[in-house]
From Swiss-Prot:
Annotated OBG-type G domain residues: 85-314
Entry's family note: Belongs to the TRAFAC class OBG-HflX-like GTPase superfamily. OBG GTPase family.
Matches recorded under NCBIfam families: small_GTP
Chain positions recorded as GTP binding sites: 91-98, 137-141, 267-270
SUPFAM superfamilies: P-loop containing nucleoside triphosphate hydrolases (SSF52540)
Domain TGS per the UniProt entry, residue ranges: 314-389
Record InterPro entries: Beta-grasp_dom_sf (IPR012675), DRG (IPR045001), G_OBG (IPR031167), GTP-bd (IPR006073), GTP-binding_2 (IPR031662), GTP1-OBG_CS (IPR006074), P-loop_NTPase (IPR027417), Small_GTP-bd (IPR005225)
A single cellular component GO annotation: cytoplasm
Name this protein carries in UniProt: Uncharacterized GTP-binding protein MJ1326
Amino acid sequence: MLFLLSLKRIFIFRNHKFNIVGDVMGIEEEIRRIEEELKKTPYNKATQKHIGRLKAKLAKLREQAQSRGGGGGGKGYAVKKSGDATAAFVGFPSVGKSTLLNKLTNAKSEVGAYAFTTLTIVPGILEYKGAKIQLLDAPGIIVGASSGKGRGTEVLSAVRSADLILLTVDIYTLDHLPVLEKELYNVGIRLDQTPPDVKIKVKERGGINVSSTVPLTHIDEDTIEAILNEYRIHNADVVIREDITLEQFIDVVAGNRVYIPSLVVVNKIDLADEEYLKYIKQKLEEFGKDYILVSGNKGINLDLLKEKIYEKLGFIKIYLKPQGKKPDFDEPLIMRRGATVKDVCEKLHKDFVRNFRYAQVWGKSAKHPGQRVGLDHKLEDGDILTIVIKR
């Protein structure tokens, strides 16, 4: 009897697993069908609404494929964030990500002359100009990673929380760059973009009302309504303050996108001659992203890479001044550009926000020396800050 029950459980488990696989395969087939239809459909005023609906469907299907095919079981890739900011090396296998991590930090990421040496995400800390920057060496991804191939969904999901993406290739694999960008795009990572200035307020009745403060040249009201309907939103007020594209509007409606700056890191430049280096630079200019040429093995341009990472993360230094005392210029607080007094309070102690009375600021962000400000005050590099709390 026990043997029969065990067999039944195994059958149910396997059947459930086959259903999941079948669901994912069905979703992938539908994704391919829509992608083919989009390729064949010319984009014009007459087809804009139809294309908008198709792209909204495609975005929803990709989310379903990731959630169902994200690879259960086994060791996950979650890494606790530490330091002042996080930058993640993302690239195909064997481009030298582990070597770069080891050279820049105190980490020990395994290095090998074959693909897929790194099987988990390896963190390390880069200390530079007073900042502690967490660097992540992610396992190499492959084409189709965003659909779950090679546990790619888990890897890409883990880097969503990074503050900077280091698109890493070597001198022979520049053609990986658009592929990497596409795989990141498919999991909702928008490189070098800012969130569109669009507000959607869902309501109970009244239909779809669209208002814009600028002329819309890439999307019309019918397409906006079609996309919202695809997401089962039939009553909403939409306010648009920039000339957005159809894809940007879908991003706003989906609501799970992250916007992260990037830096292209081209490794192994010690293996290229002058002529080939010219070719590489030309290709990178065409790709249109900020880049740096390095060699992990030979240590070429690694100090410049540290500086680039620091600049891209937009750090500012805040000097704390206890009440009635002199500022501490020896150990500044490292914050990110756009940080507020509240951000500083949260970094210093969990009770500072709750017990906050006021703050005083000296520096670029102050209208006058010692200006009294609240939690929402934005700080600038080099500011001196006094925080006064309830006793």
